[in-house]
């Protein structure tokens, strides 16, 4: 991409920084990811349906999982959440099944939203357990003290202090007051949804005060246009593009590697970087696969330097194209 290439006017907010960053867990925060975050925030704030489309491998699903904190949510156990991070979950990520029906879509979305509600209620449940256990132990000690008095019979056993029941009812009322925290539903692989399932998705959107994002391949916007009732509710459209050559080059020059991949510390020569940029075309999934194969080829040849020949050998073991 030429440095002097004209820049077309942007209809959506642009990220404050175009620098590609990596997080501690290896996630690549590209400029496209930051645009997706701003797009998602807008859908959430304005309660619109957003349509996100892009070729495979550019990072749509990864960005959606990152935004919704799906990885943290997947390990949540309501009854054993000691390690649960103190963050608010308000985004549902739903991946459409290959075979789907309206009832199944409604059931899956309902369960996902109930899970967010259970997380929102859990702090109250923990507090209630602690307070009620303290009251119970206090009452138990008091009953024991009375029963151990000289001349006391089992018939003299005192009744439980009504404060326990009042406290229990108080916390039950607090839990019932907790509303559904869902403010955004992200539907990945929306291309799989049939007409009736899309109508069910629209019904879910209409029934709640929330935003929604449909993620799919290029062409999904034309398919959705055939459903006027759904199409009329779309407020934002975002195209998830491949990484620019300069961004991929900057990523490689900082010796970025996918999670689980270890490459020599000697770095990459400009020729190798240029070859990787040209081979992958900004496709993040393809870049990840290619670097994984580079690691394998280095091990097979007991080499310590990444050369153009090593990259070519790694390329030959892959089907280069839109992955």
Model-derived regions: residue spans:
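C-terminal alpha-helical "lid" subdomain
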Residues: 2-15, 38, 89, 139-158, ...
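Pre-Walker A adenine-sensing motif
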Residues: 33-44
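Sensor-1/coupling segment of RecA-like P-loop NTPase cores
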Residues: 54, 162-166, 193, 204-228, ...
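A short hydrophobic beta-strand->loop->alpha-helix junction that borders the nucleotide-binding pocket
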Residues: 81-100
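Mid-core helix/loop region of P-loop NTP-binding domains shared across ATPases and GTPases
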Residues: 86, 100-200, 204, 243-250, ...
């Amino acid at each position: 991409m030429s440095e002097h290439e004209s820049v077309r006017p942007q209809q959506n907010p642009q990220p404050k920084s175009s620098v590609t960053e990596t997080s501690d867990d290896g996630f690549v925060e590209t400029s496209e990811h930051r645009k997706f975050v701003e797009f998602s925030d807008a859908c959430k704030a304005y309660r619109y349906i957003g349509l996100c489309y892009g070729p495979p491998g550019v990072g749509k699903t990864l960005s959606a999982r990152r935004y919704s904190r799906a990885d943290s949510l997947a390990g949540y156990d309501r009854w054993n959440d000691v390690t649960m991070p103190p963050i608010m979950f308000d985004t549902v990520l739903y991946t459409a099944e290959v075979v789907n029906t309206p009832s199944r879509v409604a059931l899956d979305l309902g369960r996902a939203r109930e899970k967010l509600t259970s997380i929102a209620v859990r702090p109250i449940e923990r507090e209630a357990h602690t307070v009620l256990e303290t009251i119970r132990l206090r009452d138990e000690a008091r009953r024991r003290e009375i029963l151990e008095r000289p001349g006391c019979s089992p018939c003299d056993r005192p009744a439980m202090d009504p404060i326990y029941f009042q406290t229990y009812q108080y916390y039950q009322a607090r839990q019932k007051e907790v509303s559904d925290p869902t403010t955004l539903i992200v539907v990945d692989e929306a291309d799989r949804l049939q007409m009736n399932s899309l109508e069910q998705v629209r019904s879910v959107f209409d029934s709640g005060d929330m935003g929604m994002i449909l993620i799919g391949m290029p062409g999904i916007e034309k398919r959705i246009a055939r459903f006027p009732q759904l199409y009329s509710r779309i407020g934002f459209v975002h195209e998830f593009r491949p990484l620019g050559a300069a961004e991929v080059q900057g990523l490689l020059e900082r010796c970025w590697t996918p999670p689980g991949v270890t490459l020599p510390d000697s770095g990459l020569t400009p020729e190798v970087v240029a070859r990787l940029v040209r081979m992958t075309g900004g496709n993040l999934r393809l870049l990840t696969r290619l670097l994984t194969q580079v690691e394998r080829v280095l091990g097979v040849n007991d080499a310590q330097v990444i050369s153009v020949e090593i990259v070519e050998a790694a390329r030959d073991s892959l089907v280069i194209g839109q992955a």
